[in-house]
Amino acid sequence: MGIGNANYVYWTEAANVGAPFTLTPPVISGTLSVGDVLTTTNGTVSAAPAATFSYQWMKDATVIAGATANTYTLVTGNIGGMITCVVSATNTAGRINTASNSLGPVIA
């Protein structure tokens, strides 16, 4: 909002009130053999209004195409790799991305 007179103009920016922020990070659980299913928690997020969550699984810091659910089934291509899930919390005020713990290496 800008206000002023002939000599001065004052400008303020609205604060990004209510944007999500992480209180505790997400955690992956499961066993590390091909065919097993890993599951991630959302972690704990403070957000008002409430946040919605999305997921992106990664192997060795590289995105796994199509792996965007809160569960992931390990495949042969994961052998030897470290698996992480990035959980995004989004609301009308903003978004935060938080990486989970890494699990690995994946075995056959």
Which residues does each predicted region cover?
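Ser/Thr/Pro/Gly-rich low-complexity disordered regions
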Residues: W11-A108
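Short, intrinsically disordered N-terminal pre-domain segments
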Residues: M1-W11
